[in-house]
């Protein structure tokens, strides 16, 4: 799935991302809620206003979960097993939303790290985020 080059690219940019988990995660969610308002339906109990503590906390969880996948690039399925079960069985998140989130996350990284998000790194991150999405939707089948 991910080549050695892809893995190196993902790990390299992740060192810039992980220290901003809450900020980038919240920004990603806010962007997703704005651009794709239907995604708000999964968060009826959240204060979705800009700067919301709930959005910041959940954004941090999302980025940290992606970080867990980065730390286990050769076994993302094992690393994200509980999240896969949660999203498929309990939360019943429409799988398309993972693609929307990934797209918004790439935009956030492009805003904050334009020089680091080279075409090669962008392609590697896209493959990585697709792989994470596949893992999270595996329990839907």
Curated annotation (Swiss-Prot):
SUPFAM superfamilies named among the record's database cross-references: Globin-like
Tissue-level expression: Red blood cells.
GO molecular function annotations of the record: haptoglobin binding; heme binding; iron ion binding; organic acid binding; oxygen binding; oxygen carrier activity; peroxidase activity
Entry-linked InterPro entries: Globin, Globin-like_sf, Globin/Proto, Hemoglobin_a-typ, Hemoglobin_oxygen_transport, Hemoglobin_pi
Pfam families, per the entry: Globin
Residues annotated as binding O2: 58
GO BP annotations, alphabetical order: hydrogen peroxide catabolic process
Annotated GO CC locations: blood microparticle; haptoglobin-hemoglobin complex; hemoglobin complex
UniProt domain Globin: residue ranges: 1-141
Binding-site list for heme b: 87
Alphabetical list of CDD domains matching this protein: Hb-alpha-like (cd08927)
UniProt entry keywords in alphabetical sequence: Heme, Iron, Metal-binding, Oxygen transport, Transport
Miscellaneous comment in the UniProt entry for this protein: Sphenodon Hbs have properties not found in other reptiles: poor cooperativity, high affinity for oxygen, small Bohr and haldane effects, appreciable phosphate effects (those properties are also found in the Hbs of primitive urodele and caecilian amphibians).
Role: Involved in oxygen transport from the lung to the various peripheral tissues.
Family statement drawn from the similarity comment of this UniProt entry: Belongs to the globin family.
Record text on subunit structure and interactions: There are three forms of hemoglobin in Sphenodon: A, A' and D. Hb A is a tetramer of two alpha-A and two beta-1, Hb A' is a tetramer of two alpha-a and two beta-2, Hb D is a tetramer of two alpha-D and two beta-2.
Protein name as catalogued: Hemoglobin subunit alpha-A
Naturally occurring in which organism (per UniProt): Sphenodon punctatus (Tuatara)
High-level lineage: Eukaryota, Metazoa, Chordata, Craniata, Vertebrata
